[in-house]
UniProtKB/Swiss-Prot annotation:
Repeat recorded as keyword: yes
PPR repeat boundaries on the chain: 12-46, 47-77, 78-112, 113-147, 148-178, 179-213, 214-248, 249-279, 280-315, 316-351, 352-382, 383-417, 418-448, 454-484
Family: Belongs to the PPR family. PCMP-E subfamily.
Species in which this protein is naturally found: Arabidopsis thaliana
GO biological process entries: RNA modification
Gene this protein is translated from: PCMP-E94
The name this protein goes by in its record: Pentatricopeptide repeat-containing protein At3g20730
Pfam families: E_motif, PPR_2
Length: 565
């Protein structure tokens, strides 16, 4: 419905105000400009009430330019005018403008009051501007607002948000009386800085002093419960919230579902979710993520996703990304394609880096390399994981040359590879026998990029060298990493198997000795060593190794036999 503006009706400020209220209900920017122009024509724009309402509506429309012009035309601007404008900027989220206006106010030598400080400190907090906030704190201490509850509360909120909990606690302890905002800011600050125990202690003190918590308090405490992974605390907080009358709060239910999922109780999370009439995006996302991490619960995740589509619940890229990860886990590229198609048709879903990476990963791990490449090339922005996922996909499916080409392109575009990128490349080299190039890549990782080799990297390079018969070189690498990186039994097993195939008795004994110290009851270790001895004609040693296997109490292995006799 459009607002009809006529000069015959807009004859007084009160009628202009009524017309502006209609604009605020209908969010009509065009009509707002029309009424503003009409008020100027008829000489009513100097009316302060009308001007204030115009400023508010312009800011709600995101039109900072017109709002600021109106403010600049106020002839006599006192502390009330400045504070009102700073407060509007802060309340509407225009925090840089609020800070800029506060500085102008200071230059014009207008003294701030507690409401000015409260608003500008809120902007500092939301922007994370600790330096500016501390400067304003200095002005507070010099003035007469230092003991004001609003100002103290704003200061501790700023320090808590910026991780300065000691300074926040000083403000908190110096307050003669504390409101709920102050308690919540402290509890949330401790939670955000991983001081969960202090959050719980402060909550106990809050209850002791007779302060009633709200949904925000419970939200912070539930996040603290996630930090310590304590299901018992989540249940206790749930019970207390119901007792205090917050059991039906949708915000609290969201927090509880998330906490139950992350503390390992999918059953309680599901029960809460099922009890709500309206499906909530955050709750659904938390449940889908939780179910995706349980191998036997993937069907439940699909049920929730289908339920969201049926009930037309708002969808986002996080949900779609989680569903694609499930498709990757269960190797269902068919369902993955359907979800991809749904995402393409939806106007709600933004194809961000995380979603693009999930698509690359799903298609690459399912062997659909062409689709993985298409998803990669269509991404507007890519991170190191995007490149690494496709490199790993090429390597996994034997496209070694393309993996190297993509790595070279990555280097050319100055995307810094990480340890997983090099692990994918080394794995590809190992499986395709590209020993020389693999060694060069390993050297690049260590000396050019300064990435320390993990056990997985060493396992790849040792396996690659050993497969190609470079047993001495592989063992030299093992020796050089003694005391730095502990090799797994699977790495030693691969090395022993390579030694056996290449008939190197001496290094077979070294590998077998290491394996037997790690897994003394595993028969395959004895059998491999005995096979090496037998292949080299050392029958006595082979027999002794078999005896050792029996004496160790290893699981019995059925003896080999022939049908020819």
């Amino acid at each position: 419905m459009m607002l009809v503006v006529s000069e015959n009706y807009l004859l007084s400020p009160s009628l202009y105000l009524k017309a502006l209220k209609l604009c605020s209900y209908q969010n009509v920017k065009k009509q707002l400009l029309l009424i503003h122009g009409n008020s100027i024509t008829n000489g009513f724009c100097s009316n302060l009430q009308l001007k204030d309402m115009l400023i508010d509506l312009y800011l709600k429309q995101g039109d900072v330019k017109h709002a600021r012009k109106l403010f600049d035309r106020i002839s006599k601007r006192d502390v009330v005018s400045w504070t009102a404008m700073i407060s509007r900027f802060s309340r509407c989220g225009y925090h840089p403008d609020a800070l800029l206006l506060f500085k102008e106010m200071h230059r014009e030598d207008v003294k701030a009051n507690q409401f000015t400080y409260g608003s500008v400190l809120k902007s500092c907090k939301d922007l994370g501007c600790l330096k500016e906030g501390m400067q304003i704190h200095g002005s507070v201490e010099k003035g007469n607002c230092a003991g004001n509850l609003i100002v103290r509360s704003a200061l501790l909120s700023l320090y808590a948000r910026c991780g300065k909990m000691e300074e926040a606690r000083l403000q908190f302890d110096s307050m003669k009386e504390r409101d709920l905002v102050s308690w919540n800011a402290m509890i949330d600050g401790y939670t955000a800085n991983a001081c969960a125990d202090t959050s719980f202690s402060l909550f106990q003190l809050m209850l002791t002093e007779g302060k009633k918590p709200d949904c925000f308090t419970f939200g912070s405490l539930l996040r603290a419960s996630i930090v310590v992974k304590c299901l018992e605390i989540v249940s206790e907080l749930h019970g207390l919230a119901i007792k205090l009358g917050f059991g039906r709060s949708s915000a609290l239910i969201r927090s509880l579902v998330n906490a139950y999922v992350k503390c390992g109780s999918l059953a309680n999370a599901w029960k809460l979710h099922e009890g709500t009439k309206k499906r909530d995006l955050l709750s659904c996302t938390a449940l889908i993520t939780g179910f995706s991490q349980q191998n036997n619960c993937t069907s439940d995740a699909f049920d929730i996703f289908k339920d969201m589509i049926r009930m037309k619940t708002k969808m986002d890229e996080v949900v779609v990304s989680s569903m694609l990860k499930i498709c990757t886990t269960i190797a269902s590229v068919t369902i993955g394609r359907q979800i991809h198609g749904f995402a393409l048709k939806s106007s709600q879903i933004r194809f961000d880096v995380a979603l693009g990476n999930s698509l690359i990963d799903m298609y690459a791990k399912s062997g659909e390399i062409e689709d993985a490449v298409l998803a990669f090339e269509e991404m507007k922005e890519k991170d190191v994981r995007s490149w690494t996922s496709l490199i790993a996909g090429y390597g996994r499916h034997g496209n070694f040359e393309k993996a190297i080409d993509l790595y070279n392109r990555m280097e050319h575009e100055r995307i810094k590879p990480n340890d997983v990128t090099f692990l994918s490349l080394l794995s590809a080299c190992s499986h395709t026998g590209q020993t020389e190039l693999g060694w060069k890549i390993y050297d690049t990782m260590i000396n050019k990029h300064g990435i320390e080799a993990r056990e997985e990297h060493l396992s790849c390079i040792i396996d690659m060298l050993a497969r190609s018969g470079y047993l001495e070189e592989a063992y030299a690498l093992i020796r050089s990493k003694e005391g730095i990186v502990s090799l797994s039994s699977s790495t030693w097993g691969a090395f022993l198997d390579a030694c056996r195939r290449h008939g190197n008795v001496q290094l077979s004994k070294v590998a077998a000795t290491q394996l037997l110290s790690m897994e003394p009851r595993k028969p395959v270790n004895y059998i491999n060593l005995a096979s090496v001895y037998a292949a080299n004609g050392a029958w006595d040693n082979a027999l002794n190794t078999r005896k050792l296997m029996k004496e160790s109490g290893s699981c019995n292995k059925a003896p080999g036999y022939s049908l020819v006799y």
